[in-house]
A protein has these predicted regions:
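Short, ordered loop/turn segments at secondary-structure junctions
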Residues: 42-43, 80-82, 136-139, 184-187
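Flexible beta-alpha connector loops of hexameric P-loop NTPases
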Residues: 83, 91-114, 146-161
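Glycine-rich phosphate-binding P-loop
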Residues: 25-54
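Conserved P-loop NTPase nucleotide-binding/switch module
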Residues: 125-168, 172-175, 186-188
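N-terminal pre-Walker A segment at the start of P-loop NTPase domains
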Residues: 2-26, 61, 69-74, 78-85, ...
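Post-Walker A helix-loop "phosphate-sensing" segment adjacent to the P-loop in P-loop NTPases
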Residues: 54-65
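Conserved H-loop
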Residues: 178-181
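Phosphate-binding/switch loop-helix module in NTP-utilizing enzymes
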Residues: 104-139
């Protein structure tokens, strides 16, 4: 791949591994927990996340993809506006909807971005995922974070959505689910 740009790991995340049929390799290791990858537009954040997403599959040796590995239970989460949700408990993230809909047994034929992403998290946990891969670009902003200004405009008691970032630590510490999040526009992450 003559026009390729080699990936260079940040020194703080660099690790080496000895492979039985290849010897020692060096690269980036992302350990369990909550990892935030930030950078400007077109700096490769989403590309890196896509490589990790594909790291659940075995690859034929030769182009480097065989060295990209991710937890086999990794799931990429995104907002899927318009998707159907049936009988899913999204109350960890969404409560007190204005129309009185039950969020412990939530169903809709036409989900919003935030309800679809909340359902995706719950479905991922139920499926046994130990790693969520999230790209800010494909997420529902109001599901991911609430900034200080919005908290002043709408009090916590009146906001039905508890942002993912407020639950990420508990998801890791209590449920054993790690998160890798790539972001480039919001400092709230």
């Amino acid at each position: 791949m003559k026009d390729s740009i080699p990936f260079v790991s940040p020194k703080t995340m660099e690790a080496s591994f000895v492979l039985p049929h290849h010897g020692e390799i060096r690269g980036m290791a992302v350990f369990a927990g909550i990892t935030l990858i930030v950078g400007g537009g077109y700096h490769g954040k989403s590309t890196l996340l896509s490589a990790l997403q594909m790291g659940v599959y075995d690859h034929i040796a030769g182009d480097g993809r065989e060295f990209v590995l991710a937890d086999e239970t990794a799931v990429k989460l995104r907002a899927e506006e318009g998707r159907s949700i049936r009988n899913t408990d999204i109350s960890l993230f969404i409560n007190d909807l204005p129309n009185g809909k039950d969020t412990k047994n939530f169903s809709t034929p036409d989900a919003s971005g935030s309800t679809s992403q909340a359902a995706g998290v719950v479905e991922g946990i139920e499926a046994g995922s130990r790693l969520f891969l999230i790209d800010e670009d494909t997420s529902a902003t109001n599901f991911m974070v609430r900034d200080d200004f919005m908290q002043q405009v709408i009090s916590r008691e009146k906001e039905p959505i508890t942002p993912f970032l407020e639950r990420a630590r508990d998801l890791y510490e209590k449920a054993g689910v790690s998160t890798i999040l790539v972001a480039g526009s919001s400092g709230a992450f």
